[in-house]
């Protein structure tokens, strides 16, 4: 008689879960990557600010495929007779000019647009693994004073306020175009992050959790990411013995975490109590759960990301802004009020680069603030009106319904930030015949995705079918207003 031997093998974890565990056990490697990015970040932001501004015709590839993009529209014969526009020899850019252009392209044309995409697809991995500002803030916190976090700092409205103020200030100093302005804003933010980290917390990312200007934006976009760290509450509670607390840098209660919004996806908690693992999910799951976000989060989405951000991307190409500026200048001249037309503001207050023939008057600054604020109030107000109407008809909270706009908002931010990418590529003579169709396809995806989420929320949570149907015009208004703003920018202006 032979005894049968039965061997039990532990369940092999899915690939994503194993990736999360790898992140947890390879913290030193991740730290090395973070410090490498810190150095690269410093190179992109600091060095160009101390180099001369490039010549207006300097190009990264001025001797390569970009050469044909240079056209002389003012060519004249020896006797002064104007000649038809014709190709001219490209300007021979110096090494420091190419370096500044490369830094601008990499930082604004590649880095930031694809950070937005990474949040949409992978959650806040950028924050937990790659962000140089977060790494510096945590390092300072590990060697700082370790004070308790004051109540005023934990106010939920800081992300909204910081995003709005940073965006407005960035437009006044032309942060996308000039390295000095970029160093002022981004360097200032980094210094503030280090200072907050040194003062508060103990090895935590207090700045990232409560004060970072883009933390609120990333928290909203991460809600539709198809991967997240899933918490198995039953496994957590049934795990034998005591375990050390999770070293969660953004100060989350990991056991009760149900949203990817604040999770930095750093992987430190992966495998904890055999209850935390990196997992795939439906990108719609968190929005369709119908949980109500904080009012400050909903306002950031409606008036910040769909208002201020669109206004900031829009004013530089808006004929309405040009007409407003012209009319205001004429009005001032007629009344002999000339000081608003003076361009004597310092560069750190208003754009002032005479060598690049780019200076803002006091009138320009006032009108930029007025235009962006006006767009925010009009667009945000219209979106809020539509959401409020739909919410009242369907008897659901408007803040929960606002989350359905995240896909359209995220895609819109990517399209807006990629305008700088397009500017650089067009200057180099890159073929862009595909651009209009690509923009249209992405915008359509955003509208359809957000529309589908909104309808699902209405029909799933409204008390009856009739109320859900009555709410549809409100949802349609919110979607139409947001889409129309981008249609103006890309196709009508």
Where are these regions (language model features)?
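Non-ligating segments of multi-cofactor redox enzymes
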Residues: 2-261, 271-493
């Amino acid at each position: 008689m032979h005894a049968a031997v039965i061997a039990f093998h532990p369940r092999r974890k899915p690939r994503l879960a194993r990736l999360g565990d790898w992140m947890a056990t390879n913290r030193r490697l991740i730290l090395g990557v973070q410090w490498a990015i810190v150095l690269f970040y410093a190179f992109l932001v600091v060095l160009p600010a101390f180099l001369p501004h490039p010549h207006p015709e300097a190009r990264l590839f001025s001797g390569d495929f970009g050469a044909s993009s240079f056209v002389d529209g003012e060519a004249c014969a020896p006797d002064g007779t104007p000649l038809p526009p014709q190709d001219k020899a490209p300007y021979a850019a110096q090494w420091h000019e190419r370096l500044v252009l490369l830094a601008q392209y990499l930082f604004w044309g590649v880095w930031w647009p694809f950070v937005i995409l990474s949040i949409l697809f992978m959650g806040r991995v950028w924050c937990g693994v790659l962000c140089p500002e977060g790494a510096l803030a945590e390092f300072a916190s590990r060697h700082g004073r370790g004070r308790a976090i004051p109540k005023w700092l934990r106010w939920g409205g800081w992300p909204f306020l910081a995003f709005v103020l940073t965006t407005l200030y960035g437009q006044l100093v032309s942060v996308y175009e000039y390295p000095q302005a970029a160093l002022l804003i981004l360097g200032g933010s980094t210094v503030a992050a280090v200072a907050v980290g040194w003062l508060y917390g103990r090895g935590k990312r207090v700045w990232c959790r409560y004060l970072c200007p883009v933390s609120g934006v990333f928290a909203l976009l991460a809600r539709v990411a198809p991967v997240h760290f899933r918490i198995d509450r039953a496994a957590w509670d049934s795990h034998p013995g005591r375990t050390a607390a999770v070293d969660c840098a953004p100060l989350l209660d990991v056991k009760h975490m149900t949203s990817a919004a604040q999770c930095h996806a750093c992987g430190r908690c992966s495998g904890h109590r055999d209850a935390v693992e990196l997992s795939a999910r439906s990108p719609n799951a968190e929005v369709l759960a119908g949980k109500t976000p904080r009012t400050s989060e909903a306002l950031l989405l409606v008036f910040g990301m769909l208002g201020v951000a669109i206004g900031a991307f829009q004013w530089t190409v808006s004929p309405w802004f040009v007409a407003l500026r012209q009319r205001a200048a004429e009005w001032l001249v007629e009344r002999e009020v000339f000081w608003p037309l003076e361009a004597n503001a310092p560069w750190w207050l208003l754009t002032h680069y005479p060598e690049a023939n780019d200076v803002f008057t006091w009138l320009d600054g006032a009108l930029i603030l007025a235009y962006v604020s006006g767009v925010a109030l009009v667009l945000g107000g219209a979106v809020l009106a539509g959401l409020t109407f739909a919410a009242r008809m369907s008897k659901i909270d408007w803040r929960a319904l606002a989350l359905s706009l995240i896909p359209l908002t995220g895609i819109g931010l990517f399209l807006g930030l990629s305008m700088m990418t397009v500017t650089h590529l067009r200057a180099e003579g890159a073929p862009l015949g595909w651009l209009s169709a690509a923009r249209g396809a992405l915008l359509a995806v955003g509208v359809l995705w957000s529309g589908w989420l909104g309808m699902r929320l209405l029909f799933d949570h409204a008390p009856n079918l009739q109320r859900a149907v009555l709410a549809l015009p409100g949802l349609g208004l919110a979607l139409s207003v947001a889409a129309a703003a981008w249609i103006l920018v890309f196709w009508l202006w």
